[in-house]
């Protein structure tokens, strides 16, 4: 489940400066850690306002919580900038989402969707709170152990994972290089508008799990 990152407890200058600039112009911001693994945070940033563009999303994964926060905020702000630049006079359909196929479509949808129920749910739900701090043990400190745990988790959910440690002994003290292949997740095309292969088990479809378009599906 997601946890809310307490933006008011950060002592990092980069985080404080970004949040101050956003709040200063009357926008709302919420940061959520949506990662399943505490060693590697995945930060979702939601910025919303009372005028166009109504909402923008940014997401970042990093072994450093602070880096993930800063990158997700930067992405969300960039989306708002692009929304201003690419604004269209055409009204978007907020009831039928068949037209939402590519990433720019998601940008236009949430930029034009005033009082979006999914945005309001993200902004108002009472998530458990965590501080915006570095994790005490990062993936880079014990990568092989973490990879073994992750491979085991994916295997129980029907995903075969093949990986190999490619790190040269003389540079191991600087970090680790691993090659990872998950056949079921390899896209048939690198184009952004082509769906990735998912689990072949008879799980509920995305439309049943979440009726709203999601740029990170």
Role assignments for model-derived ranges:
Residues 1-217:
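Helix-biased "structured C-terminal domain" signature
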């Amino acid at each position: 489940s997601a946890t809310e990152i307490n933006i008011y407890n950060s002592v990092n200058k980069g985080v404080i400066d970004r949040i101050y600039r956003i709040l200063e112009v009357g926008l709302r911001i919420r940061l959520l850690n949506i990662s399943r693994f505490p060693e590697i945070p995945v930060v979702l940033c939601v910025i919303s306002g009372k005028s166009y563009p109504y909402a923008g999303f940014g997401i970042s994964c990093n072994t450093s919580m602070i880096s993930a926060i800063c990158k997700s905020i930067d992405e969300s702000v960039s989306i708002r900038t692009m929304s201003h630049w690419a604004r269209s006079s055409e009204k978007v359909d907020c009831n039928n989402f068949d037209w939402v196929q590519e990433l720019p479509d998601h940008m236009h949808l949430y930029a034009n969707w005033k009082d979006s129920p999914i945005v309001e749910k993200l902004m108002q739900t009472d998530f458990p709170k965590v501080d915006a701090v570095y994790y005490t043990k990062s993936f880079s400190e014990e990568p092989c152990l973490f990879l073994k745990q992750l491979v085991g988790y994916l295997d129980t959910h029907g995903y075969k994972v093949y990986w190999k440690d490619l790190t040269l002994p003389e540079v191991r003290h600087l970090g680790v290089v691993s090659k990872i292949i998950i056949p079921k997740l390899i896209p048939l095309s690198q184009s952004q508008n082509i769906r990735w292969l998912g689990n072949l088990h008879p799980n509920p479809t995305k439309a049943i799990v979440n009726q709203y378009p999601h740029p990170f599906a």
